[in-house]
């Protein structure tokens, strides 16, 4: 079992590391957000008495990078289906859920790596973790967030057959998930309806967990963040495994 999962995990990782253009291209938007918003809105944020905006913004940008990378990893399923690799994989004498788990862990590893790169860039931009001892918790939050959204991307890709449809659905999902996560603004004092929508957004708990572990500022608390992320990750991984097992070849 572990051989199948490991091989597919390693394949995802090798594809990522061999594509330097993909690595550089996927960093463009997070870096733009970090520097343009961080330094552009920084003075306004400070005048409002909210402190250093780079400190506040960085966890949200790390989460954004993980979200984009992990959820779009599902497109590789459609790509492999069109070029015949998926068929060869699915006819192998192994349970399909193992194939799905291997691909999901591979996509999550890539997304976590992207998040770590953005974290390093944020240090150059002036971000300072409040407590280095809490970095391990931030890393765990990154992993859980990556697994959650990779599983979501895989589940959606399992029921679609064309890249255009997948990209349209992902774009429809990604922007609300990101903007309702509290990545760009504090969650205190918001209208009730907006607070409800934010609490229903799973990315909110990834952002809050990163912000809590990196800066000590948490709207919920780390226990709630970890619990919600674990539960939703398990549910989406199970759903993704089921939908992946129903793919027709």
What is each PLM-predicted segment?
Residues 1-29:
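Aromatic- and glycine-rich beta-strand/loop motifs that create alpha-glucan
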Residues 15, 46-48, 128, 178-235:
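Membrane-interfacial helix-loop-helix junctions in multi-pass membrane proteins
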Residues 39-50:
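Short, hydrophobic transmembrane alpha-helix segments
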Residues 32-37, 53-124, 145, 153, ...:
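Hydrophobic alpha-helical transmembrane segments of multi-pass membrane transport proteins
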Residues 24-32, 161-181:
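Pore- or pathway-lining transmembrane helices of multi-pass membrane proteins that form conduits
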Residues 96, 100-170, 217-241:
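Alpha-helical transmembrane segments and their short interhelical loops
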Residues 20-21, 55, 97, 164, ...:
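Residues that define the loop-to-transmembrane-helix transition and helix capping
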Residues 242-249:
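Short cytosolic juxtamembrane segments of multi-pass membrane proteins
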């Amino acid at each position: 079992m572990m051989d199948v999962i490991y091989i597919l995990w390693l394949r995802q990782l090798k594809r990522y590391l061999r594509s330097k253009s993909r690595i550089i291209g996927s960093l463009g938007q997070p870096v733009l957000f970090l520097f343009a918003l961080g330094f552009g809105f920084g003075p306004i944020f400070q005048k409002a008495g909210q402190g250093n905006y780079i400190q506040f913004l960085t966890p949200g940008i790390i989460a954004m990078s993980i979200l984009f990378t992990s959820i779009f990893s599902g497109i590789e399923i459609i790509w492999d289906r069109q070029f015949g690799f998926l068929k060869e994989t699915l006819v192998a004498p192994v349970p399909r859920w193992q194939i799905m788990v291997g691909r999901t862990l591979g996509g999550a590893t890539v997304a976590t790596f992207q998040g770590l790169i953005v974290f390093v860039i944020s240090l150059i931009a002036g971000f300072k973790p409040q407590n280095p001892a809490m970095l391990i918790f931030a890393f765990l939050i990154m992993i859980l967030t990556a697994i959650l959204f990779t599983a979501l991307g895989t589940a959606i890709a399992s029921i679609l057959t064309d890249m255009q449809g997948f990209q349209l659905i992902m774009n429809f999902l990604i922007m609300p998930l990101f903007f309702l996560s509290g990545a760009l603004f504090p969650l205190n004092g918001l209208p009730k309806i907006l607070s409800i929508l934010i609490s229903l957004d799973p990315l909110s708990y990834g952002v809050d967990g990163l912000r809590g572990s990196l800066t000590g500022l948490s709207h919920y608390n780390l226990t709630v963040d970890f619990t919600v992320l674990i539960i939703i990750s398990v549910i989406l991984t199970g759903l993704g495994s089921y939908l992946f097992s129903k793919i027709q070849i």
